[in-house]
Structure formats: C-alpha cells, structure tokens
Design a protein with these regions (language model features):
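An exposed, glycine/acidic-rich loop-and-rim segment of catalytic or binding clefts
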Residues: 2-361
C-alpha cells in the first residue's frame, strides 16, 4: 500500500483507501509542471485539496475538504466539494412531469429535492482511471429508478490540472430512456486558505458576469421570474466584496440567508465556453476565474456551514467559503421556458467548467 504523502497538502493515500459498496476508494493527486496540485478521491468525486501559491510563493489549500475517507463519507456537510447529480440544485416537492408521466423524487431539503437526493452521485464510489500525472477520469452508472429518476444514466467526469493552473472538469452522460440531467460540482472555495485563522469570505472581491438572476421563495425554489441584478445586492458585474451586501435588508437575501441564487450568465450563444465569475483575496492576492458552457451559475456563500472541523483540524464556520456551481437552472423541469435539462436516448449531455487560479499583485 502506498503511504507516500502528497508533497504540498500532506494527505496520505492510505488514508483514502477502503472498500465501500463493494468498491475500492483511493486518492488521486494531479500535478502540473509548476508543482501545483489538485487531490481528489473517487468517493463522490470529492476534491479534497487544491494547492496553489500566494503572492509570496506560500502554498495553501484553497478548497474545503477532509483528510481521510471516513470523514469524507460522514461529513457534516454531505455536499462538501463533491460531484452532484442526477439533478444539481432543487426541484419543488421533488415532483416533475416528463413525457406525460409524473415522477416523485426523494425530498431531502425540507419538502424539496436537493442535489440528487440523499444517495445522489456524491454518495457513491466511482470507477477511476488514471490517465496521466495531471488527469483522472471517473465513471458511474446510475440505475433506473435511483432516487426516483427515470432511465439508466451513465456518467463520465474528467478532472485535469493544466500547466496554466486551470482545474478543468468535463462531463458526459448518456441514457437509455428519456430523463433529466443537471450535473455540477459543489467545491467550497476558500482562496484565502482553509487554515486561515480568520476564514471569512466577506472581504473576498467577487465579480459575476450576469445581468439577471433567479429570485427564490422562502424554500429556495425559483419563483419563475428572471430579474435584473441592477440596483440589487445581486449586482456583481463590477467587482465588490462578497460581504458588502450579504446582510442587506432585502427579501431575496433573507430567503437565501445570504447568497444562494442562480445567475443567468451572459452568453453570446448557447453552450459557448465563456467567462462566468472571478474572485480575489486582497491579502494573499490569489485569484480564481470561472469559465463554463452552462447557462447558469449558483453562487452559494456557505450560509449553512455548521462550524465543523475539516482537513488537518481546520474549522469551516458559516460563510468561510464560496461555491460557484455551473448548472442548468434550479427546478427547470417545472419551468418549461428555462433552458432544457431533458436528455434522450442517442443524445449526449456535455459540460465543461474551468476554475483558473492565479496571483494578481
């Protein structure tokens, strides 16, 4: 058994090796020619470390995660930096109609369905194939009826760390029966470093390339409206600190307990890979840019993080991380004018999302 620690984040492969659901789990460390690293496990596709330098060359882990497989499996935050499917985000009351048939999904977020259900893609061991030093491909076949979904869905996800410090996630999925498909990744980013003694994201400078967003009701389900961000706390078209308006006296901020809303990304054409968002830590000068082919981007500011211990004893309190979940829109099956999430036999679902890291002094 390989016990060699990861050079920069100190994780040990043996701490991620066990058997779950009859399948073996493991740790895969992706490295580029700069010596930077992304560490992932095939349990739920969890990203457990992203090691990048600051303006002085000092390294820190920029994603919240755990340092052993049992803590990943039993995390107080089940969606901590994992793959999400079959349906990312919420579906109202877990109900939708497809081709004249009504489906009832598991409801695990009050009366609503969230992120594929309690045993969604985050809670399964994926088959893993190491492609190179900087790439791994994960595969999972979701059987017919899993969490109430129709059709058998086969999913491939490729993780790659490029020499330009881009963490690239490519998704593909096929089905044998008409179904819905909305995949995403729920990485909790702390570009200030997860071990920072004051881990708040309030001072992180954020930009989101969206003129519109989806308002939500008190259960976080879209109302069906598509509203302008102009003149609201949701206007990040010009960079501003995340904390500037996060506690504003605003109904939408109150409904989300902060930011937990889908942005309608500005696109010249459907499916183009384009700039979605950017954050910068003014202290370390680290930056992260998000590019995606998806029409929507859920910005979630860790409003419900439960102040638990994570990797190497780091504490993950409320609003210590921000998520940028590239996706179709929430509750799309119940809003026919939202971008379609339907997938039919013979079609291939595809998505590409890039998280690009850098330093800007």
């Amino acid at each position: 058994m390989n016990t060699e620690p990861v050079n920069k984040c100190g994780l040990k492969r043996e701490d991620f090796q066990t058997t779950v659901q009859g399948k073996k789990t493991d740790l895969f460390v992706l490295r580029n020619n700069q010596g930077n690293e992304v560490a992932v496990t095939n349990y739920g596709g969890a990203v457990v470390a992203i090691m990048m330098p600051d303006k002085d060359g000092n390294y820190a882990n920029l994603v919240q995660g755990h340092d052993n497989i049992q803590d990943v499996i039993n995390s107080p935050e089940p969606f901590l930096s994992v793959l999400i499917g079959r349906y990312g985000n919420r579906i109202k009351e877990g109900k939708f109609t497809l081709h004249g048939k009504e489906y009832q999904l598991a409801c695990n977020n009050g009366k609503n369905h969230l992120h594929g259900g309690p045993t969604g893609f985050h809670a399964h061991v994926w088959d893993a194939t190491r492609m190179s030093d900087n790439a791994v491909v994960l595969k999972y076949t979701s059987p017919y009826g899993e969490e109430g979904f129709s059709g058998e869905l086969t999913v491939w996800v490729a993780y790659t760390l490029t020499d330009d410090n881009e963490f690239v996630i490519k998704y593909q999925a096929t089905t044998n029966k008409m179904t819905i498909c909305n995949l995403t990744h729920h990485a909790f980013f702390s570009i200030q470093g997860i071990a920072n003694p004051t881990p708040t994201i309030d001072n992180i400078i954020c930009q989101v390339n969206a003129d519109y967003y989806l308002p939500i009701d008190e259960t976080s389900i879209p109302t069906g409206e598509i509203l302008k961000v102009e003149g609201t706390p949701f206007d990040f078209r010009t960079p501003k600190p995340i904390g500037q308006d996060i506690n504003a006296d605003d109904e939408q901020i109150k409904n989300g307990s902060g930011y937990d809303h889908n942005y309608v990304l500005n696109k010249k054409e459907e499916g183009e890979l384009s700039f979605a968002a950017r954050i910068k830590d003014p202290v370390s000068c680290r930056t992260m840019e998000v590019y995606t082919t998806e029409p929507g981007l859920q910005m979630y500011t860790g409003n419900f993080l439960a102040d638990f211990k994570g990797q190497h004893g780091a504490t993950f309190p409320r609003r210590s991380a921000v998520c940028f979940e590239a996706q179709k829109f929430p509750d799309t099956p119940n809003h026919p004018y939202f971008p379609s999430c339907r997938l039919c036999p013979g079609e291939t679902y595809t998505q590409k999302t890039i998280y690009k890291f850098g330093v800007e002094k």
